[in-house]
């Protein structure tokens, strides 16, 4: 139960961090390009990689705390960091077809389903 509560709190903090940082960046650089989201996503990748790398090579972080940080905070901050981490795993193990299907499939299917959802939602 404690892990679930910590996961929820970390998720709330990640959401607030995403909202705050994306808004700050977008106000600093107004325009049609979603720079706030772009910055959040790439910084999320950096942070996810850093935490994973530190846990892998430097410190022994309790598995529950790793879940709270990576799934809770980073999952709410950006799911793009998880997507790129899993993509890199496929690339590093030479699973190029799986990587292409995973990365390309999410982008293309995601865009198609977003378009379908928008169209359906506009009809309701």
Swiss-Prot record:
One of its GO terms (biological process) is cellular detoxification of fluoride. It comes from the Bacteria. It is found in: Cell inner membrane. Na(+) is not transported, but it plays an essential structural role and its presence is essential for fluoride channel function. Keywords: Cell inner membrane, Cell membrane, Ion channel, Ion transport, Membrane, Metal-binding, Sodium, Transmembrane, Transmembrane helix, Transport. Coiled coil: none annotated. GO terms for cellular component: plasma membrane. Its main location: membrane. Na(+) binds at residues 75, 78. The chain crosses the membrane at residues 4-24, 35-55, 67-87, 96-116. InterPro entries: FluC. It is a multi-pass membrane protein. Pfam families: CRCB (PF02537). PANTHER family: FLUORIDE EXPORT PROTEIN 1-RELATED, FLUORIDE-SPECIFIC ION CHANNEL FLUC. Fluoride-specific ion channel. Important for reducing fluoride concentration in the cell, thus reducing its toxicity. Belongs to the fluoride channel Fluc/FEX (TC 1.A.43) family. This is Fluoride-specific ion channel FluC. It comes from Nitratidesulfovibrio vulgaris (strain DSM 19637 / Miyazaki F) (Desulfovibrio vulgaris). The gene is fluC.
């Amino acid at each position: 139960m404690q892990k679930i509560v910590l996961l929820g709190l970390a998720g709330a903090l990640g959401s607030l961090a995403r909202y705050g940082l994306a808004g700050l960046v977008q106000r600093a650089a107004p325009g049609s390009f979603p720079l706030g989201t772009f910055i959040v996503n790439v910084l999320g990748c950096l942070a996810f990689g850093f935490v994973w790398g530190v846990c892998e090579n430097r410190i022994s972080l309790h598995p529950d705390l790793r879940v709270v940080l990576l799934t809770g905070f980073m999952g709410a901050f950006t799911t793009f960091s998880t997507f790129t981490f899993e993509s890199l795993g496929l690339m590093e193990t030479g699973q190029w077809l799986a990587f292409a299907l995973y990365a390309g499939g999410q982008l293309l299917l995601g865009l198609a389903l977003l378009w379908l959802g928008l169209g359906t939602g506009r009809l309701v």
